[in-house]
């Protein structure tokens, strides 16, 4: 019931089709864009003042580009152009645009996290020897990754810090 929503202070929205090739392009785009819009709309209508969203490194257009695409500059930062070629990256750009619009309309804190390739602790021993031997294997991820524990800390910091807007 809606009466219980008054006790919710923050929404952390990470639900989505998490990458390409898990669903059709149209389903990936529609699922991710509509779910983000619906979360933003419902949360702001209920007066929730903080929303944390999962965006992605794929917004830069390097990760799932057809052929080799290089970033326009390195290190890549939040001001780097977002020009993805794939439905997943496009859906994340659309989510960021919606988040900025909702933030401007409501004044809520809405934080979109452009998360890099998430690595679990056991994957260091399994994957990283190959990455060290051939760094080009990480090119599509702009040589970046985030440890699951660091991602958890990032979300925790977002929960603790108020007033950043978008």
Kindly give the residue locations of the regions a language model identified:
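SDR active-site strand-loop-helix element
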Residues: 11-15, 51-57, 61, 113-115
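NAD(P)H-binding glycine-rich loop region in Rossmannoid oxidoreductase-like domains
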Residues: 1-31
């Amino acid at each position: 019931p809606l009466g219980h929503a008054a006790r919710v202070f923050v929404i952390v929205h990470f639900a989505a089709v998490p990458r390409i090739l898990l669903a059709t392009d149209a389903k990936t785009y529609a699922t991710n864009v509509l779910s983000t819009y619906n979360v933003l709309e419902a949360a702001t209508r209920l007066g929730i003042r903080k929303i944390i969203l999962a965006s992605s490194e794929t917004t830069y257009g390097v990760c799932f580009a057809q052929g080799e695409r290089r970033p326009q500059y390195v290190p890549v930062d939040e001001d780097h152009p977002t020009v993805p070629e794939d439905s997943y990256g496009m859906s994340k750009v659309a989510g960021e645009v919606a988040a900025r619009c909702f933030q401007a309309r409501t004044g809520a804190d809405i934080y979109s996290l452009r998360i890099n390739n998430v690595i679990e602790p056991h994957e260091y021993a399994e994957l990283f020897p190959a990455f060290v031997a051939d760094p080009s294997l990480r090119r599509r991820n702009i040589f970046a990754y985030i440890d699951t524990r660091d991602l958890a800390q990032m979300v925790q910091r977002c929960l603790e810090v108020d007033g950043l807007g978008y």
